[in-house]
């Protein structure tokens, strides 16, 4: 037996009901019986031969990466775009998007997290004002077809055999990474090529590159040409960490800069927010927060000085002149990939390409050490020649 959706072949994950077997592994995406064929979804296909509208011209490095990506895709190869945070991964996809749309092909953009889906959709609307863009995620399922579809990886179950180009952002992010069901659904949604974006590709992805199954394009230079922010690691007790968080948030506020304070658990965020609110305007966002979008809008509009958050906001959110402090950085929830993404929030703006990233911890574990090493290595790859 084999499930035609998630490719499950484990007998223990099939159930028997009224004379038929069905798959329990992907039951969350509706019941699918064994031997039941999945029909291709019918979507609009528009031929569009236009160009994206950008606020700035791509750098020479971005143009080269963009060209290489489209060249590999045009040759029928899947591509991993390994680019540092803030390098402009989304914009580098635009040449490929235009190339596929010019041929009347269907383009989809899938991301693990709902917040990032909304942000990417906004950026695509700005770059492609002549095209219809729809976001498909929790709370946004009324419209499921447009010239370009942006959805969570969970929502890809709606699109079997749909996309000639499927762009998978945050390849290494929860819940997509390591999830066999979501990965199988993504593979089924793509009838052409996959363009996979990551600042922290995992070992399996890099193995596909070594085995020549996937092409690799790298870009570690940000458009403003300033180095990535290497975090300052401070090893102190939890009590002193709290005092440093308060001090740094007040200091940044006086400099008219906002702060993201990352905590490992909701309960850490709850009491830390209460303490910080005594000194600066502070709010809290985590997975159970009901009004996430409203709080994020307030932070973007500078109505808040500090936003305490869990790793929910480690990716996708872009705030000019934001500073980052990680509290209890040696907690297991802060993996190397997570920390690289978190400190990648700093220094993304052309107007303020510098900033501070501070990792507070009781001791520097391997994740912290690897984070510092990998960010430094990316900088060395780009700027080593200028240091000599």
Predicted regions and their residues:
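Conserved strand-helix element at the start of the C-terminal RecA-like helicase core
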Residues: 82-90, 100-101, 105-120, 250-276
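Post-DEXD/H (motif II) to motif III coupling segment of the RecA-like Helicase ATP-binding lobe
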Residues: 161-165, 170-235, 241-248
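Conserved helicase ATPase core of P-loop NTP-dependent helicases/translocases
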Residues: 118, 131-143, 283-310
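Interdomain "pre-motor" coupling segment immediately N-terminal to P-loop NTPase/helicase cores
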Residues: 1-45
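Conserved segment of the helicase C-terminal RecA-like domain
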Residues: 191-204, 345-374
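N-terminal pre-P-loop "Q-motif" helix
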Residues: 54-77
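Conserved SF2 helicase motif VI
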Residues: 176-187, 191, 332-355
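A short beta-strand element within the Helicase C-terminal
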Residues: 163-169, 306, 317-330, 340, ...
């Amino acid at each position: 037996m084999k499930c035609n959706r998630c490719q499950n072949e484990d007998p223990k994950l099939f159930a028997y009901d009224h004379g038929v077997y069905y798959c329990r592994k992907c039951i969350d995406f509706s019941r699918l019986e064994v031997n039941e064929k999945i029909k291709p979804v019918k979507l609009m296909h528009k031929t569009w031969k236009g160009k994206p509208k950008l606020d700035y011209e791509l750098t020479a490095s971005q143009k080269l990466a963009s060209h290489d990506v489209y060249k590999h895709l045009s040759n029928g190869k899947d591509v991993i775009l390994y680019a540092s945070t803030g390098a402009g991964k989304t914009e580098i996809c635009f040449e490929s998007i235009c190339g596929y749309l010019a041929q009347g092909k269907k383009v989809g953009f899938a991301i693990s997290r709902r917040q990032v889906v909304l942000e990417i959709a906004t950026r695509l609307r700005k770059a492609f004002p002549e095209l219809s863009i729809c976001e498909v995620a929790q709370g946004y399922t009324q419209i499921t077809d447009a010239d370009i579809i942006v959805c969570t990886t969970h929502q890809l179950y709606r699109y079997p055999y749909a996309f000639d180009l499927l762009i998978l952002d945050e390849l290494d992010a929860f819940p997509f990474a390591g999830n066999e069901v979501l990965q199988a659904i993504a593979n089924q949604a793509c009838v052409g090529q996959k363009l996979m974006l990551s600042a922290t590709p995992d070992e399996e992805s890099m193995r596909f590159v070594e085995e020549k199954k996937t092409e690799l394009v790298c870009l570690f230079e940000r458009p403003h040409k300033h180095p990535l922010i290497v975090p300052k690691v401070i090893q102190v007790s939890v009590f002193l960490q709290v005092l440093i968080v308060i001090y740094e948030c007040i200091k940044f506020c006086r400099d008219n800069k906002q702060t993201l304070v990352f905590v490992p658990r909701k309960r850490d965020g709850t009491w830390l927010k209460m303490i910080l609110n005594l000194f600066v305007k502070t709010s809290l966002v985590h997975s159970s927060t009901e009004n996430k979008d409203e709080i994020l809008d307030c932070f973007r509009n500078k109505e808040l000085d500090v936003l305490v958050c869990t790793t929910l906001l480690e990716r996708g959110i872009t705030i000019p002149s934001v500073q980052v402090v990680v509290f209890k950085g040696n907690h297991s929830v802060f993996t190397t990939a997570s920390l690289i993404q978190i400190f990648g929030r700093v220094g993304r703006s052309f107007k303020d390409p510098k900033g501070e990233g501070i990792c507070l911890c009781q001791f520097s574990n391997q994740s912290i050490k690897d984070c510092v090493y990998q960010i430094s290595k990316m900088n060395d790859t780009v700027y080593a020649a200028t240091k000599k």
